[in-house]
Regions:
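N-terminal Rossmann-like NAD(P)+-binding domain of SDR-like oxidoreductases, especially those catalyzing
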Residues: 1-178, 232, 302, 309-317, ...
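C-terminal substrate-binding subdomain of Rossmann-fold SDR/epimerase-dehydratase oxidoreductases
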Residues: 18, 24, 31-32, 56-59, ...
Length: 325
């Protein structure tokens, strides 16, 4: 029998990479898509015909019950969320509904309709927020500073609660920033590689950035979805931090991207724009992924410069094609 996996957020960066991985592993893949909205299928274009799409919404319990009951999945991956931290201050209620309560609705649907199914909750390094401890591991206290992070903390503890209360296989992956050529253009890394490519081909003169000094632990997304899958293959459900253990600033990312594009006077293209500053900034996130290494045998492979290269080359190709039109 083929294993069945049900993925929320399947059209996003992580969902699409996870779907590809599971298809390679001969899973039957089901993906939740929202009705009545414009779903962007760009990331799953090449595998559309191999996925069964199910309509539903993390804001609607009945649709989730129906989906889980019908599919009877072996594994459920909750990657669906409003994932851009910046907008969480302007839409805190919607953020909490989808990212926080959405996780609860889905695990509740699993408990009631497919209790033997394994459940993965996509947590985030943002839960550590304004932490005093570095690096951060599974025992670091949470100090969330954005509505997004607070919603993720709620989802995290609900997952732990269902594991402990009902004996469900439910695990949290606390993933540090992971990027790729499929990252949304609103995210700073992709904004930089897209912007550098536009400048290189004469389509733009500037990149507007908020905080140059924010430091993050950036890895390559396809490796992280493999980590998710590994967590779900364990005998016992547990929570894991995934990250590279290295930290770089936004400024370093900018310098590296411009250097790789062969532009040395990067300063003249960067405009500091206060509107991109967050009401509360997370200063310094860096992972201690030693538990994942020891227990799962998982390790981030793609180094910082290589990550910038992958993203920049993709955007250079894309923008070059646009500039020729």
């Amino acid at each position: 029998m083929m294993k069945k996996a049900f993925i929320t957020g399947i059209t996003g960066q992580d969902g699409s990479f996870l779907a590809e991985l599971l298809l390679k592993k001969k899973y039957d893949v089901y993906g939740l898509i929202r009705w009545k909205t414009m779903n962007n299928f760009e990331n799953v274009e090449k595998i559309m015909d191999q996925i069964t799409f199910v309509e539903g919404d993390l804001g609607d319990q009945i649709s989730l019950n129906k989906a889980v009951k019908k599919i009877q999945p072996d594994e459920v991956y909750n990657l669906g969320a409003l994932s851009f931290v910046g907008t969480s201050w302007t839409q805190p209620i919607q953020m909490s509904e989808v990212t926080g309560l959405g996780a609860l609705r889905l695990i509740e649907a699993v408990k009631d309709n497919a209790p033997n199914s394994k459940f993965y909750q996509a947590s985030s390094s943002e839960v550590f927020g304004n932490t005093k401890n570095a690096p951060q591991d599974e025992n670091t206290p949470f100090r969330p500073v954005s509505p997004y992070a607070i919603a993720k903390v709620f989802g995290y503890w609900m997952t732990v609660n269902y594991r402990e209360s009902y004996g469900m296989f439910a695990c949290n992956g606390i993933l540090f920033n992971h990027e790729s050529e499929r990252r949304g253009l609103e995210f700073v890394t992709r904004k930089i590689t897209d912007g550098v490519a536009r400048i290189k081909f004469g389509l733009s003169k500037e990149i507007r950035i908020g905080n140059l000094d924010a430091r993050r632990d950036w890895g390559y997304a396809p490796e992280y979805v493999e980590g998710m899958w590994m967590m779900m293959q364990q005998k016992k459900a547990d929570d894991f931090v995934l990250g590279t253990g290295e930290t770089h600033s936004v400024k370093e990312f900018i310098i590296e991207a411009f250097a790789q594009a062969g532009i040395d006077d990067w300063q003249k293209y960067i405009v500091i724009d206060k509107s991109f500053m967050r009401p509360a900034e997370v200063p310094h996130l860096v992972a201690n992924p030693s538990k994942a290494e020891k227990v799962l045998g998982w390790k981030a492979k793609t180094k910082f410069k290589e990550l910038v290269k992958i993203m920049l080359e993709n955007d250079m190709k894309r923008i070059q094609a646009i500039s020729k039109k």
